[in-house]
Regions:
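Single conserved hydrophobic/aromatic residue that forms the stacking wall/gate
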Residues: 1-6, 10-11
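Short, hydrophobic secondary-structure boundary micro-motifs
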Residues: 36-38
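Short, charged amphipathic alpha-helical segments flanked by flexible coils
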Residues: 75
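C-terminal peripheral helix-coil segments that are non-catalytic and often amphipathic
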Residues: 30, 60-68, 84-130
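Amphipathic alpha-helical packing segments from all-alpha helical-bundle domains
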Residues: 15, 19-33, 45-71, 82-89
Length: 130
C-alpha cells in the first residue's frame, strides 16, 4: 500500500491491502486443483489468459491508487503503463509460483507476505514517497 504515512486513510488502505493478500492466498489454496490446472495446463483453453486478466485488474487498480495519491496531495513520480504491468505481472507470477511448485499453504502464506513487504517498500521507493 502506498499512501499518506501516518494518516487514518493510510492505515485503512494498508489494512485492506494486507487483507487482500491473505484473501488471495486463501482463495487460491481453497481451490488449489483448479489453480494448478490454470497455472500449468490451461494453454489452448478458455483459461489460458486467466493470469493475464488478473494482472490487468491489478494494473488498473494500481493506476487508480496512484491517481488517488495525487489527489490526496502526494507528489508521486510517474510510471508508464509498461512498468506498472511488469510489476503487477511479477507479483501475480510470484503467487502462481507457489501453485506451480506445490508449495504447502503455510509456506505460501509466508512467501506472499514477503512479496507484500517487498512490493510495498518497492512502490514507495519508485514512486518517490518517503
Amino acid at each position: 500500500c502506498a499512501c499518506l504515512v501516518g494518516s487514518e486513510m493510510c492505515i485503512r488502505d494498508r489494512d485492506v491491502a494486507d487483507h487482500e493478500y491473505v484473501w488471495m492466498v486463501d482463495y487460491v489454496y481453497d481451490h488449489f486443483d483448479a489453480f494448478k490446472l490454470i497455472a500449468c495446463c490451461s494453454t489452448g483453453t478458455r483459461y489460458e489468459h486467466y493470469l493475464d486478466a488478473l494482472i490487468e485488474i491489478e494494473v488498473n487498480a494500481s493506476h487508480l491508487l496512484m491517481e488517488k495519491m495525487q489527489r490526496e496531495g502526494l507528489n508521486v513520480l510517474p510510471l508508464d503503463d509498461d512498468m506498472v504491468h511488469i510489476l503487477a505481472s511479477a507479483l501475480f507470477n510470484g503467487l502462481f509460483e507457489t501453485v506451480r511448485h506445490d508449495t504447502p499453504k503455510e509456506k505460501a502464506v509466508a512467501y506472499v507476505d514477503t512479496l507484500r513487504t517487498f512490493y510495498s517498500a518497492g512502490w514507495f521507493k519508485i514512486l518517490g514517497i518517503q
